């Protein structure tokens, strides 16, 4: 079956009393057992049965199994946010005295998790240019617990060579962990590129309508992962209590079924819009990996296929121009989410990176002159006209 068909049909078996066509929402905390022996076996994992919805729920399990089947993974685990997925993953791999090799180009909260929170627990962080394979090789040593990166950085839109990095990491028995939020896991094969663990903010493309918050950890079960699965599920999930709710899992299952169709339209819209934006003299630079002269275009196509996602960044003359541009928008929404059905715009330097110092933002290549656009399902002509009138009013 093709991915779109799999997303709709995989892993759901109608076993409820009414043969519901859609996955039911099991809005329950606890589950009754026929006798004490079976109850004991469930709690000690001798039999597979849900015992408490803080760690397992049939609605959530269906989403997890569907994601694992779609990605050819060993396991998928659903969390209540993308940051919960990232933090639980890294804490499952890291320990005092260990180090994580990563990039300076990270989502703001991921950056602070690494350089502030985990450092307080004795985990070292090595920030490197991950487009430089030799720099990655030199950074990895016997205490490296993982290499972590975003497959398309936000808002720099930088692409690293996953296959090359995975080969370097695997030479030293180190797993490669990637955040694939900005390119859906249904659109490319992370496993074939050597990725060992994939984390996703399912609040974005999977949710689609910006109505549910969640995260996914996709474990490919490779030899480089060690006891990761045991730690993630048997320790982190149990002890930190960040499991996805059944209501969210139900909504995100519906989102998953339409993800491929939405993504194809959003990517097509983004490419057409990016080309049109180049005709506006007020825009100094259009950054989109779908454009043929983008420095990462060839690598992105090799890794992610012909579609390039729904995120475009544009550079204007100044920070003041960026603020005025946002204020001039009439159709596109000023909001911080990504990959909603609606198109969104934000000034990253003053919002998601606003708590960082100017020097820190500069070191992360977050510019005051950049606007990030998340392209939705609207007609491209309407989006272009809105941006056109916004920049012409500067």
Segments predicted by a language model, with ranges:
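N-terminal "arm"/small-domain region of PLP-dependent enzymes with the aminotransferase-like
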Residues: 1-57, 371
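Conserved PLP-enzyme active-site core in the AAT-like
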Residues: 7-13, 75-280, 287
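Glycine-rich beta-alpha junction loops
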Residues: 12-14, 27-33, 204, 258, ...
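Conserved N-terminal alpha-helix of the aminotransferase class I/II PLP-enzyme fold
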Residues: 30, 35-84, 109-116
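Short amphipathic alpha-helical segments
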Residues: 48, 74, 213, 248, ...
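PLP-dependent enzyme catalytic core of the Aspartate aminotransferase-like
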Residues: 115, 124, 262, 320, ...
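Short, well-ordered beta-strand elements within core beta-sheets of diverse protein domains
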Residues: 251-261, 309-317, 372-376
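Conserved small-domain helix->loop->beta segment predominantly found in fold-type I
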Residues: 271-330, 334-342, 356-362
């Amino acid at each position: 079956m093709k991915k779109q068909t799999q997303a709709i049909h995989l892993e759901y078996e109608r076993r409820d009393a009414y043969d519901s066509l859609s996955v039911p929402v099991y809005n329950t905390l606890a589950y009754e057992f026929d006798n004490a022996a079976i109850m004991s076996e469930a709690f000690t994992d001798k039999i597979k049965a849900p015992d408490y919805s803080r760690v397992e729920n049939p609605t959530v399990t269906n989403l997890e199994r569907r994601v694992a089947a779609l990605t050819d993974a060993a396991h998928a685990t659903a969390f209540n946010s993308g940051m919960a997925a990232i933090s639980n993953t890294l804490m499952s791999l890291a320990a005092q005295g260990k180090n994580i090799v990563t990039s300076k180009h990270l989502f703001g909260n991921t950056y602070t998790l690494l350089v502030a929170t985990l450092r307080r627990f004795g985990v070292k962080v090595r920030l490197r240019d991950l487009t430089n394979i030799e720099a990655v090789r030199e950074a990895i040593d016997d205490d490296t617990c993982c290499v972590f990166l975003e497959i398309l950085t936000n808002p720099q839109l930088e692409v690293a060579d996953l296959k090359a990095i995975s080969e370097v990491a695997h030479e030293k028995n180190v797993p490669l962990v990637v955040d694939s939020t900005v390119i859906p896991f249904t659109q490319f094969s992370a496993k074939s590129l050597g990725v060992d663990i994939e984390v996703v903010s399912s609040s974005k493309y999977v949710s689609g309508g910006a109505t549910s918050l969640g995260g996914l950890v996709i474990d490919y079960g490779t030899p480089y992962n060690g006891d990761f699965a045991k730690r993630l599920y048997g320790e982190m999930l149990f002890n930190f209590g960040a499991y996805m709710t059944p209501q969210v899992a139900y909504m995100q299952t519906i989102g998953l079924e339409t993800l491929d169709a939405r993504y194809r339209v959003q990517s097509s819209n983004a490419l057409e819009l990016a080309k049109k934006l180049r005709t506006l003299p007020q825009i100094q630079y259009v950054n989109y990996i779908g454009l043929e002269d983008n420095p990462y275009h060839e690598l992105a196509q090799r890794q992610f296929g012909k579609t390039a996602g729904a995120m475009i960044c544009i550079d204007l003359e100044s920070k003041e121009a960026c603020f005025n541009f946002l204020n001039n928008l009439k159709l596109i929404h000023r909001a911080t989410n990504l990959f909603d059905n609606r198109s969104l715009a934000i000034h990253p330097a003053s919002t998601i990176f606003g708590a960082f110092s100017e020097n820190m933002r500069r070191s992360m290549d977050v510019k005051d002159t950049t606007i990030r656009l998340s392209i939705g399902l609207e007609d491209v002509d309407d989006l272009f006209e809105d941006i056109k009138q916004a920049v012409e009013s500067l």
